[in-house]
Amino acid sequence: MTEHAIKYRLIKKEKHTGARLGEIITPHGTFPTPMFMPVGTQATVKTMSPEELKTLGSGIILSNTYHLWLRPGDELVAEAGGLHKFMNWDQPILTDSGGFQVYSLVQNKKNITEEGVKFKSHLDGRELFLNPEKAISIQNNLGSDIMMSFDECPPFYQPYDYVKASVERTSRWAERGLNAHRRPNDQGLFGIVQGAGFEDLRRQSASDLTSMDFAGYSIGGLAVGESHKEMNAVLDFTTPMLPEDKPRYLMGVGAPDSLIDGVIRGVDMFDCVLPTRIARNGTLMTHFGRVNIRNAKYEYDFTPLDPMCDCYTCTNYTRAYLRHLIKADETFGLRLCSYHNLHFLVNLMKDVRQAIMDDNLLEFREDFCERYGYNQPNAKDF
């Protein structure tokens, strides 16, 4: 077995679910799990400083390989001393492979071949090519603690035969990426399980990848349009296929109920742009549900956004002030709203970890969902 750059330590299993309390040890520090990871697509979490992210308890952040490859360029980042030094972040960083962005830009399935993928840049329209070796090379230059193998991410509702061929290609690409990885002593590489909603294909993908001894395993191809029930069903049969001594990462998931349901099914790590993206539109997560701060009813509301939240935003500013800032397109409003939403999800996971320790995660979920409004008719996803 390979001596990996990152290690997972299991602390406790919850008695009534598949939830796990643990920690992940990386070259840039250790963080507790389950953990939500804020997304810093272009080497910054939008509107947030590294110091603020540390204050709210973000033990690890995510950056995007595709975007950093195009701008400023992975070789420039390497010259700067790696992503940690470039962005002044001394804690763990995870980078994705760029695959998800690439497939959103592919104009024809014929451009996906065994060798790699041809697509056009979203910046200037020039033709680009990315393959498993290049994706690993870029991430080696970036110097992230946790890297992703290059995978094909087909939409959830593709025909069986297409998904089968895609899974088989992803497995071959994973092996190529593993062979191309030139910094295994200080960067851990994860394999990504695909297979859409097909249990046998998820099983095949998990079997292929676990035979290669990656540092950890990601569950991809979810949060791409399927229902919450379908996502949970895939997790029900996929997570048990993954090794218990390795981290499990559910990609692209950030809705509060989905985070809790993922933890119940044995997932350790999550990421999503959701909290910062919706914050910039004035949508906020609170202990009492979703708040659209633009609504007129908050114009004269001089109470805290969330009386159960102790974040900087909620302890210093009112709903009326936040509404004013967002309506006026003031940058400070974007910052305050982003800070709150990130604090909310990071602290939700802290509460989830305590519920695992106390063996009452199912009761915690029931209480949280009732207060948040998930049990109401036509409840919003987030």
UniProtKB/Swiss-Prot annotation:
Positions of substrate binding: D96, S97, G98, G99, F100, D151, Q194, G221
Keyword Phosphoprotein: no
Record SUPFAM superfamilies: tRNA-guanine transglycosylase
The keyword Transferase appears for this protein: yes
Region (RNA binding): 252-258, 276-280
Pathway linked to the protein: tRNA modification; tRNA-queuosine biosynthesis
Cofactors that this protein relies on: Zn(2+)
Gene Ontology terms describing biological process: queuosine biosynthetic process; tRNA wobble guanine modification; tRNA-guanine transglycosylation
GO molecular function, one term: tRNA-guanosine(34) queuine transglycosylase activity
Annotated family: Belongs to the queuine tRNA-ribosyltransferase family.
Quaternary structure annotation from Swiss-Prot or TrEMBL: Homodimer. Within each dimer, one monomer is responsible for RNA recognition and catalysis, while the other monomer binds to the replacement base PreQ1.
Function: Catalyzes the base-exchange of a guanine (G) residue with the queuine precursor 7-aminomethyl-7-deazaguanine (PreQ1) at position 34 (anticodon wobble position) in tRNAs with GU(N) anticodons (tRNA-Asp, -Asn, -His and -Tyr). Catalysis occurs through a double-displacement mechanism. The nucleophile active site attacks the C1' of nucleotide 34 to detach the guanine base from the RNA, forming a covalent enzyme-RNA intermediate. The proton acceptor active site deprotonates the incoming PreQ1, allowing a nucleophilic attack on the C1' of the ribose to form the product.
HAMAP family: Q_tRNA_Tgt
Protein name (record): Queuine tRNA-ribosyltransferase
Taxonomic source organism: Lactococcus lactis subsp. cremoris (strain MG1363)
Organism phylogeny: Bacteria, Bacillati, Bacillota, Bacilli, Lactobacillales
Gene behind this protein: tgt
